[in-house]
């Protein structure tokens, strides 16, 4: 009994800072909550509430002047701007990849479409991760708000930014590929072949044989898998990746789900990815068919049911994993 009691004392005396660091790390989350009022449960929030600091070498020069003039102190506005740009980059790469696939006749290649879906998400998350979180998905934003990882007020701000960034990206990609679209239209006949072939650039459409029930279940299940994976990757208690690898883990998750379940209905999994480009395609002349497709039994499915799938995923993750973590102050595993 004496040896057992002496062993930890000896180690503490040998390196007195190690145990102190461990104790400090154990209560790091509580300290962060008390200082910022935010839940530290996600990798993507690692700089969200950090105080802005001016480096000394900027003071007195034009960089410092513009930084001082343009800097916005309102946290929600900063979140909106960051998430808008993150979503803009994500959707620009995604829609640009979709356009290239259509022009080259490879729109039905699941590996190609999965790759540009996944890597587009990777770089979009990198843009917004340090400020807004870079969630770039209204359904996942709803899921993390449901679990208390972001406030509902911030949730609404991020969702509006995501829809906005997606819409602007749709417009920019259309302008960039305008001449290519016109040239591609010359090869189409007068029976709407051009619209049928290129509408898939902007939004998802189901296979002709897919029933409404099958489409609903597809959207719920795909987004549920995405939600479970995303919440596990971002859970600080789980075996999560480092901050720098977090976007790659999410991108790999998106690629995997897309490869597995995109055949029947496109696996949108993201309301802003589908609705905003669909609105843009209506504006540029694709007609009401982008909404009336399948007798109005489709357009609302990839918009509404990803929210349902994200909700199911959040509930399942909490029931099967989240609520079973040991107490924060407990050292036992």
Swiss-Prot record:
A motif (NPA 1) lies at residues 137-139. It is a multi-pass membrane protein. Induction: Transcript abundance is medium and expression is slightly down-regulated in the inactive stage (during anhydrobiois). GO terms for cellular component: plasma membrane. It is found in: Cell membrane. Keywords: Cell membrane, Membrane, Repeat, Stress response, Transmembrane, Transmembrane helix, Transport. A motif (NPA 2) lies at residues 270-272. Pfam families: MIP. Residues 1-26 are annotated as: Disordered. InterPro entries: Aquaporin-like (IPR023271), MIP (IPR000425), MIP/Aquaporin (IPR050363). GO terms for molecular function: glycerol channel activity; water channel activity. The chain crosses the membrane at residues 85-105, 116-136, 156-176, 213-233, 245-265, 303-323. PANTHER family: AQUAPORIN OR AQUAGLYCEROPORIN RELATED, AQUAPORIN-9. Aquaglyceroporin that may modulate the water content and osmolytes during anhydrobiosis. Aquaporins contain two tandem repeats each containing three membrane-spanning domains and a pore-forming loop with the signature motif Asn-Pro-Ala (NPA). Belongs to the MIP/aquaporin (TC 1.A.8) family. This is Aquaporin-1. The lineage of its organism: Eukaryota, Metazoa, Ecdysozoa, Tardigrada, Eutardigrada.
């Amino acid at each position: 009994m004496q040896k057992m009691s002496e062993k930890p004392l000896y180690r503490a005396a040998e390196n007195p800072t190690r145990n102190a660091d461990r104790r400090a790390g154990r209560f790091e989350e509580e300290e962060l909550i008390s200082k910022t009022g935010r839940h530290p449960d996600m990798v993507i929030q690692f700089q969200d509430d950090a105080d802005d600091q001016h480096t000394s070498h900027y003071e007195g020069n034009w960089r410092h002047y513009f930084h001082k003039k343009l800097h916005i102190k309102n946290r929600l506005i900063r979140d909106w701007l960051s998430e808008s740009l993150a979503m803009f980059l994500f959707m620009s790469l995604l829609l640009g990849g979709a356009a290239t696939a259509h022009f080259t006749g490879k729109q039905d290649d699941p590996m190609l479409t999965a790759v540009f879906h996944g890597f587009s998400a990777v770089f979009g998350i990198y843009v917004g991760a340090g400020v807004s979180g870079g969630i770039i998905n209204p359904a996942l934003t709803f899921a993390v708000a449901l679990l208390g990882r972001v406030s509902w007020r911030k949730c609404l701000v991020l969702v509006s930014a995501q829809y906005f960034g997606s819409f602007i990206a749709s417009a920019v990609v259309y302008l960039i590929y305008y001449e290519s679209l016109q040239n591609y239209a010359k090869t189409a006949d007068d029976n709407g072949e051009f619209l049928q072939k290129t509408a898939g650039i902007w939004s998802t459409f189901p296979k002709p044989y897919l029933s409404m029930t099958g489409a609903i279940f597809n959207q719920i299940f795909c987004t549920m898998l995405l939600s479970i994976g995303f919440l596990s990757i971002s859970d600080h208690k789980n075996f999560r990746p480092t901050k720098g690898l977090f976007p790659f883990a999410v991108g790999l998750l998106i690629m995997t789900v897309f490869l597995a379940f995109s055949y029947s209905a496109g696996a949108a999994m993201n309301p802003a990815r589908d609705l905003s480009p669909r609105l843009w395609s209506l504006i540029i002349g694709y007609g009401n068919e982008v909404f009336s497709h399948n007798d109005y039994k489709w357009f609302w499915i990839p918009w509404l049911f990803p929210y349902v799938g994200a909700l199911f995923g959040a509930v399942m993750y909490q029931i099967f994993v989240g609520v079973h973590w040991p107490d924060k102050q407990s050292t036992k595993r």
